[in-house]
A protein has these predicted regions:
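Long, charged, low-complexity, helical-prone intrinsically disordered regions
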Residues: 1-278
C-alpha cells in the first residue's frame, strides 16, 4: 500500500492541510470543471487510458521539472489521492483508469489514526524490520511507529521494530534482480545500515558521472546485496543487452550461475534474447 492510500483518508478530511495539500487543493479547485469532465467521461465509458480523457484545465500545472504543463497526468494523480479515481489495469504500456467506486471494495473508511496503524503494520510486514521513527519524506514513510515488537540491530543506533510473525521462520535465500524502487533498497539509509550497500539510481545523472549505469538493478544473493546489473532492453533488436555486472564482492561459481539465470529469466520475461558482455 502506498502513501496515497493514507492521503485518501486525510485529504479531503478533518484537521489542517499540509502546505503541499493546500497548493494541490487550490489547483484542483481552479480546474474543477476539468475534474468533473474526467469523472463524467469515466462514468460513461471507463475504464479508459489517459489518451482518451479530456484536458480542459484552465490553469496549467506549473513546475520546474518534467511534470510542467502535464495537466491530465497530474489531475489523475490528485484524483487518485482524493479517492475518486483508481487504476483499473492496463493494455500494453497504457494504464487504464476508472472511477474508484468501481475498483475499491465498498468498505467503511477507517479513521485516520486507524489507517496509519494499518499502514504501519503492512509496511513492517513487507520490510520485516524497520525504524520506529524515521526521516519525514514526501513519499511513503519509511518508519513503522509502534507496530510489531522492539528490536536491536547490533552496531546500529536507533529504535527498531520487528514483525513478530516472521520471527523464527526458516530462511531460504535466493538470487534476484531488484527494481531500483524495491522496498529493500528504497530507504537508502536503512539499506546502508543493514546491508552496507552503496547504491543510487543514476538515471538523473549525466552519463559521464554514472558509476553503475542508467538504470542499474541491485543484485540480491542469499541475505546480501552483492552487486548491480547494468542492462538495456533493445526492443527493436529483440535483445537484452548486458553492459556489465558490477560485483561488490567476489562471486563464487554458484553466485555467477545464479545471477546468470536471473538475467536469462529477465530476458525471457521481456521476450528478448540476452546478450552478455564479451
Amino acid at each position: 500500500m502506498c502513501s496515497s492510500d493514507l492521503e485518501m483518508a486525510e485529504w479531503p478530511g478533518s484537521g489542517e492541510l499540509r502546505e503541499w495539500q493546500e497548493d494541490v487543493r487550490d489547483w484542483v479547485i481552479a480546474n474543477n470543471a476539468c475534474r468533473r469532465d474526467i469523472l463524467e467521461r469515466l462514468r460513461a465509458d471507463g475504464p479508459l487510458p489517459i489518451s482518451e480523457l479530456p484536458d480542459t484545465c484552465v490553469v496549467p500545472w506549473a513546475s520546474s521539472g518534467w511534470n510542467n504543463n502535464r495537466n491530465l497526468r497530474m489531475m489523475l494523480d490528485k484524483l487518485v489521492q482524493r479517492g475518486e479515481v483508481a487504476a483499473a489495469g492496463g493494455t500494453g504500456r497504457d494504464r487504464l483508469w476508472d472511477l474508484a467506486s468501481r475498483i475499491y471494495p465498498d468498505d467503511p473508511v477507517p479513521p485516520v489514526e486507524e489507517a496509519r496503524r494499518r499502514l504501519d503494520e503492512r509496511r513492517l510486514h513487507g520490510l520485516g524490520i524497520a525504524r520506529a521513527k524515521g526521516t519525514k519524506l514526501p513519499i511513503e514513510p519509511v518508519d513503522v511507529g509502534e507496530a510489531g515488537e522492539p528490536a536491536v540491530v547490533e552496531g546500529v543506533r536507533g529504535r527498531w521494530r520487528v514483525d513478530p510473525a516472521q520471527l523464527g521462520r526458516p530462511f531460504a535465500g535466493r538470487a534476484a534482480l531488484l527494481s531500483p524502487f524495491d522496498r529493500l533498497v528504497a530507504d537508502r539509509k536503512r539499506m546502508d545500515e543493514l546491508f552496507e550497500f552503496d547504491y543510487i539510481l543514476e538515471m538523473y545523472k549525466p552519463s559521464g558521472a554514472r558509476i553503475w549505469g542508467y538504470y542499474a538493478l541491485p543484485i540480491l544473493y542469499g541475505d546480501r546485496l552483492v552487486g548491480k546489473l547494468d542492462a538495456r532492453a533493445d526492443r527493436e533488436g529483440g535483445e537484452l543487452r548486458v553492459a556489465a555486472v558490477h560485483r561488490d564482492v567476489p562471486f563464487s561459481t554458484a553466485m555467477t550461475a545464479a545471477v546468470d539465470r536471473e538475467i536469462r529469466d529477465l530476458a525471457r520475461w521481456l521476450d528478448l534474447e540476452p546478450v552478455m558482455p564479451d
